[in-house]
Amino acid sequence: MPPSTGSVPPAASTPAAGDEATAAGRVLLGRYELGGLLGRGASAKVYLARDLLTGRDVAIKSFPNPRHGGGLRGGEEDVLLRPAPIEREAAILPRLRHRHVMRLREILATRKKVHFVLDLAAGGELFSLLDASGRMTEDLARHYFRQLISAVRYCHSRGVYHRDIKPENLLLDDAGDLKVADFGLGAVADGALHHTLCGTPAYVAPEILSRKGYNPAKVDIWSCGVVLFVLAAGYLPFNDASLVNMYRKIYAGKFRCPAWFSPELRCLVRRILDPNPATRIDTEEIITHPWFRQDASHFAMAQLMQHGHDEEAKFKTEFKEDDMARDMTAFDILACSPGSDLSGLFGAEPGKERVFVGEPAAAVLSRVEEAGKKEGYMVTREGKKGTGPVYVKGENGGIVAKVCVFKIADAVSVVEVVKGYGAEAARFWKARLEPAMKPPAAI
């Protein structure tokens, strides 16, 4: 049987006075009614909650606010010395919008707590689907492995690496689809090899053990291979009562496939659990492997692996002025509040620029449209009251930028620019969009 996923059943909790994140029935910041405790980790607790505005059940992950000196693992000194899970997830989750990645809906904060509002994994853990023998059929394992690789491939395309893929972090929504959760050990691409010792022992890649630096994409692929093996075999590929011996097996890539594995599955597992990261298969090779593509039409595979609609979903969220006001309260106004200083914790949101202007929205958006058309891009304006958003799309249909203007006061508006990914979007911002934020007399 696979190892226990360590889930924690709902439990009663005796809150400290004034701690709204620990008492069932309390309402968090006027919107979320807290329910039972779903689980806890080294740095956070997760609660069931109900959104009083929509009636939707959500999960709320609550952390001590480091700015209040709440301490994460070892106290305030440790928080200052290394990025805490809250900082990692706050940097990573806003980048991600994919059907198989747990969605961050909102970040809220009080003086003592920071709360992530997440989709609820109503279907429980992936490993709850294992049969009496402790494993899945090969077809069912393939179904969920496809969803896992779709999520991992997407994250890597966004420069995000999980580094702790394991059963506890593979959840199911109410439709039974996979959701990859918990990016507390995640990393963002910086062009360098990583040296941090991350991961869970049985799922850790051999190059991490060498402490010589590693490619986090290949580390994630290795962990996906261990998950696939466990789903189809019902036990770990590298297991030993002695942790040292288990590490030796991992480092040597020493394992045996069970007799019921098909030849194609054996081949794929051996390519993934290759102890040499240089020759280990990557996600592009995985999605073309015969076992992975078996019984799937070209169209179905393209639908599973395409990122375009996810990027569109991320950028084409319905924006209303009152929604923007609520978002700015959570991320900006609150961050500047003396009582809840989060500015040093979250920093700038990745890929997003905000510029304050003293002119009507229509004038700014007209300059944005002109800048896009000068580059030969497709430009469309949506929304009401001339506030946009304006979408600027490149030759391949990918979004280069989304620009929206929100009125703050009679003579003040804020222009929010969400930049696309890659060098093209960065160049367009610097060469065209940033200058377009200034009125003509100031250019």
Swiss-Prot record:
It is an enzyme of class 2 (transferase). It comes from the Eukaryota. Its EC number is 2.7.11.1. Keywords: ATP-binding, Kinase, Manganese, Nucleotide-binding, Serine/threonine-protein kinase, Transferase. Residues 350-379 are annotated as: PPI. Pfam families: NAF, Pkinase. This is CBL-interacting protein kinase 29. It comes from Oryza sativa subsp. japonica.
